[in-house]
Design a protein with these regions (language model features):
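Conserved phosphate/ATP/ADP-binding segment of small-molecule kinases
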Residues: 154-159, 164-234
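Glycine- and other small-residue-rich loops at beta-strand/loop junctions that grip anionic moieties
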Residues: 59, 84, 137-139, 162-163
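Conserved N-terminal subdomain of the carbohydrate kinase-like
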Residues: 24-30, 50-133, 299-307
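Structural motif
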Residues: 4, 133-134, 183
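Gly/Ala-rich phosphate-binding loop of Rossmann-like dinucleotide-binding domains
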Residues: 49, 154, 263
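Conserved phosphate-binding/catalytic region of the ribokinase-like
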Residues: 1, 6, 29, 202-307
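Short glycine/proline- and charge-enriched loop/turn segments
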Residues: 22-30, 185-187, 236-238
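Glycine-rich phosphate/adenosyl-contacting loop at the front of the ribokinase-like
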Residues: 1-60, 65-76, 245
Length: 307
């Protein structure tokens, strides 16, 4: 468990609104609200810290109370922010509206990370970045910045994972040189955006990414489970049927669980099972982070699911 992980991307304050009934558009809908630290990369970071992974974060925070709350929370969780930037700006915010079944209806994101996590900024941190074994980046950053991280990771043989975040943001990867990227984790809609080819055949879309130099594509398929594609191997994993409380952060949790398994020396299937297990736990709660999680609990959840 000695490998270290560096995550680079957006940190936000999440405001989630859970509508009491099926949403009526163009009207006011009664709802309950929860507030927490969010952003794809921060959800991943928080779960890795709970699983006792040596994890650090490069992100952009504002000069406000939200930033102080985030900094203090992460410091108490053992998450290093030493190379992050604090700007004279407002900390980013993610607002989502969820239907009564817990599924996302619509969301909006105000994010300062592309403005402040730039190539010159990261160039000044290059010696720090290359000290980590695994680098995880989200697509909230500018496409040129993402390309710089890909190139740095390739030249220093670092294991780079890209989390696509959303369809519009995943499209930033469509014209990038992905050679050397270890893994990308899209859902089916994000896969279409990344592949940027005319065909809509899943096999051809996956093949196009493999030919562009990606080693693994972990395709998330919702209630159908997920499939890990490699050049000479295909690993498929189903998921049990559960009642969803909140779908926010499930994919982030899955990646954190997979990274934990990978660092813990598990094979691909077991790492995927750990990812699914953590995602299923997150689907059962309001919010994107299961704060009671630890490595022993995660292995027990996996065991229970497989029984």
């Amino acid at each position: 468990m000695s490998k270290s992980v560096l995550c680079i991307g957006a940190t936000l304050i999440d405001e989630l609104y859970f509508c009491e009934n099926t949403i009526v558009t163009h009207s006011s809908n009664p709802a309950e609200k929860t507030t927490s630290i969010g952003g794809v990369i921060s959800n991943i970071v928080q779960h890795l810290a709970l699983l006792d992974i040596n994890v650090s974060l490069i992100t952009a925070l504002g000069s406000d109370g939200d930033a102080s709350f985030i900094s203090n929370t992460f410091k108490n969780s053992g998450i290093s922010l030493q190379e992050s930037t604090v700007a004279d700006d407002s900390t980013g915010k993610y607002i989502s509206i969820l239907n009564s079944d817990g599924n996302l209806f619509v969301s909006a994101c105000q994010d300062i990370s592309p403005k402040y996590i730039t190539i010159p900024f990261l160039e000044s941190k290059a010696d720090y970045i290359i000290n980590f074994d695994i680098i995880v980046v989200d697509t909230n950053l500018d496409s040129k910045t993402i390309q710089w991280i890909i190139d740095l990771s390739r030249s220093h043989q670092k294991l780079l994972i890209i989390e696509p975040v959303s369809v519009p943001k995943a499209s930033k990867l469509s014209n990038l040189n992905l050679d050397g990227v270890y893994m990308i984790t899209p859902n089916e809609e994000e896969l279409l955006a990344i592949a940027s080819i005319e065909t809509q055949t899943e096999k051809e879309l996956i093949q196009s990414l493999l030919e562009r130099g990606v080693t693994k594509i972990w395709l998330r398929k919702g209630h159908q489970g997920s499939v890990l594609h490699e050049r000479n191997q295909l690993t498929t994993l189903s998921v049990p049927s559960i009642t969803i409380v909140d779908s926010t952060g499930a994919g982030d949790a899955a990646l954190a669980g997979w990274i934990f398994g990978h660092i813990d020396g598990e094979d691909e299937l077991t790492s995927m099972q750990l990812g699914h297990s953590l995602a299923l736990e997150v689907l059962k709660i309001k919010g994107a982070v299961e704060s009671s999680m630890n490595r022993e609990k995660l292995y027990q959840v996996k065991k229970n699911i497989l029984q």
